[in-house]
Amino acid sequence: MSERKFFGTDGIRGKVGSGQMTPELALKLGWAAGRVLSRSGTKKVIIGKDTRISGYMFESALEAGLSAAGLNVMLMGPMPTPAVAYLTRTFRAEAGVVISASHNPYYDNGIKFFSTDGSKLDDNLELEIEAELEKPLVCVESHLLGKVSRIEDARGRYIEYCKGNFPADQTLTGLKIVVDCAHGATYHIAPAVFRELGAEVIAIGDKPNGVNINDKVGATSMAKICETVLAETADLGIALDGDGDRIMMVNSKGEVIDGDQILYILACDAKARGVLRGGVVGTLMSNLGLDLALQALDIPFARSKVGDRYVMELLKELDWRIGGENSGHILNLDHGTTGDGIVAGILVLAAMRRQNATLEQLTAPMEMLPQVLVNVRFEGEHDPLSSDKVKAAQAQVESELGVRGRVLLRKSGTEPLIRVMVEGDDHNTVLAHANLIADAVKSAS
């Protein structure tokens, strides 16, 4: 595959106004994408965004570029990433575009594309778009320019879709739920979904102002929702990230329920209903406790590289349906084509209702093992992981941990760091083992 200049594993992302994230590039990107997408299909593209102040600027630039290439544009306004994927499918659009940097701060932004079926755009199409970016922008003739319209009922369509994933014979009546929208794209969606299903909802992180997205709220900053669940004596909390593709939960004791535990709940529920196809895909960072808990139920478990893109690839390769990351990206291919925080929350609530159980009861059989991560900086071009000293330290630790422990050593893809991760039954022992390996890495640096 050719080397990419613009697209990363999750579209284009960076600090606004520098590097690639400029209105100039967005205009050219819209035109280049329009050139590629106009070769077939409906010549219709949907654009959604999160609540960052820069979203308006990039939306206008993309809209102009796509129109200049002859594509019609349908604007959704602030909507979650999975909503763009869903409406791209239902409108039979040629593509969907999301303007978001997900869980990053407001001063970052990004652009990514969905294909007509709501999945991430094919690698070859991204390379074709990159090739067009190298050409001068030439506008189509005036009578061929694309038209721009707004999807006025986008919010209502997506709310109904989300609710459709909950059993029709059940309600959430009697449940008090804290919902944290991260001041992001779900602020006008998530509280409504859970209220319309019958829950009493206390919304936080639901007042975006353009610069407060993910700021001390949301799935990457759990302190506030944990405090609110306890203060309001709520049954549980649901925390989403800025673009709504990630979820973390909180039980009534104020304890965080992460992506691994959510995967366990969904797998158990699917197995109990006889609808589990194959097993569960996690990542190299998934807690060993998930692996062991699924083993006890004879549910296969496989690990992909870190990143929801790689989880999806392995799910498709194995023809399984459920997978995700401990960070809260949850994929259930029976309920969508991409990670969807609201839908994942609904599926957990459905499991609670079906089993007449609390969140604590559903996660109780899964023991989360202590996990320690140590980052070791190294200098030079050599690879510390090839050192005999490091290999010997790893072998010693793995021997002492046995089947109830795990060691993972990997290089950072962005910094000169070796990440040392150790899991086991006892935190102090795990910490000592991690430091032992880290010291070996340092001495080999």
From Swiss-Prot:
Annotated GO biological process: carbohydrate metabolic process; peptidoglycan biosynthetic process; UDP-N-acetylglucosamine biosynthetic process
Gene behind this protein: glmM
Keyword Methyltransferase: no
NCBIfam families reported for this sequence: glmM (TIGR01455), PRK10887.1 (NF008139)
Modification after translation (UniProt): Activated by phosphorylation.
Function per UniProt: Catalyzes the conversion of glucosamine-6-phosphate to glucosamine-1-phosphate.
Cofactor: record remark: Binds 1 Mg(2+) ion per subunit.
Annotated catalysed reactions: alpha-D-glucosamine 1-phosphate = D-glucosamine 6-phosphate
Cofactor(s) of this protein: Mg(2+)
Pfam families: PGM_PMM_I, PGM_PMM_II, PGM_PMM_III, PGM_PMM_IV
Any one cellular-component term (Gene Ontology): cytosol
Catalytic residues of the enzyme: S102
Binding, Mg(2+): S102, D241, D243, D245
GO molecular function: magnesium ion binding; phosphoglucosamine mutase activity; phosphomannomutase activity
Family membership noted in the UniProt record: Belongs to the phosphohexose mutase family.
PTM-bearing positions, type Phosphoserine: S102
HAMAP family: GlmM_B
Protein name: Phosphoglucosamine mutase
EC nos: 5.4.2.10
The keyword Cell membrane is annotated on this UniProt entry: no
Keywords on record: Isomerase, Magnesium, Metal-binding, Phosphoprotein
